[in-house]
């Protein structure tokens, strides 16, 4: 496992699994799921965490207790509550946050 840099990826999307896999060679990755999705296939060195954090304050505490350097919010686009909690937690803990945003859907012939 790489030394130093720790990232929490809040997953639940295919993009999140791909991202965790891609960066697991250079970051210590913890991949978090709400528990409502099936277990993803992740590299052995990625830590899987299942279940909620208990709100923004508890998430901020978790980030600090686990020496987290970065947070990537790759949750489902409609997961508004967790997205807001992640934003607040990162602001409280002083940790940089990246929000993965999917491109907007555009209709194509046959839709």
How would you name each of these model-derived features?
Residues 25, 43-46, 93-94:
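Short, structured coil segments at secondary-structure junctions
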């Amino acid at each position: 496992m790489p030394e130093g840099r720790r990232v929490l990826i809040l997953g639940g999307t295919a993009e999140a699994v791909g991202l965790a896999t891609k960066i697991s060679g250079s970051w210590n990755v913890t991949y978090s799921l709400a528990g409502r999705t099936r277990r993803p296939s992740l590299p052995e060195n990625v830590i899987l965490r299942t279940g909620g954090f208990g709100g923004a304050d508890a998430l901020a505490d978790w980030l600090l207790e686990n020496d987290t350097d970065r947070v990537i919010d790759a949750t489902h686009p409609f997961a508004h509550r967790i997205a807001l909690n992640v934003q607040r937690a990162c602001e409280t803990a002083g940790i940089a946050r990246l929000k993965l945003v999917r491109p907007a859907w555009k209709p194509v012939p046959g839709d």
